[in-house]
Amino acid sequence: MKFFPVYYFVIPCLIGIVAQVMFYGISTGWASIAIGFVFVSLQLQTFNSFVDDISGLFNRKYFNFYMEKLCKTKRADIYGILLDVNNFKKINDDYGHYVGDGAIRNIGKILSESVPKNAVPMRMAGDEFIIIITDGSEKSTAELKNTIRENINLFNNTTDMPYRLSMAMGTAEFHGESLKEFLLNIDKDMYSDKKEYYLTHER
């Protein structure tokens, strides 16, 4: 979902100019500019309410809004990837919440740089993220998971952070069921991946 605050400014201004030309002697220019600024301000407030301050990604509120829009359009081939940071509590416990917040910011950047144009990454809560893919497939979803893992490995090998990032991932196709059911399905798959991770890694 995209926002176009510029349009909210330009359109009232154009209407004001046209009205002033049609009705000579009536000044509507400044009023239309003021209305345009009000619309831009409201639009930016809406946008900011959908953005997570730490990761820079869209938030849980936007996820609900976005999925509601997708349900109304009855889009097919919608897939989700649920991601949860492995050992995130250990990062906070060992290095403090400031470093933990930095890890969340780095994950936000990695996800933003990993996703194609038909995918939207969002931070759900804490160390949990979700990516919604439209016009997707099992193959493209699996490829995106591999891309994310590769970019996480690249981050770990090219930075001097005191921690190493790793994420458990679960996937599910959205068939128009309730969001609660969709999240339960994808959560189950994610925890299966996390369980595998902890078979070979310490908590």
Task: Cite the ranges covered by each PLM segment.
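Short beta-strand-to-loop capping motifs
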Residues: I131-G136, E173-F174
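Beta-strand residues that line the small-molecule/cofactor-binding core
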Residues: Y62, R164-S166
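Catalytic-core segments of nucleotide cyclases and related cyclic-nucleotide turnover enzymes
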Residues: A142-R149, N153-T159, S166-A168, A172-R203
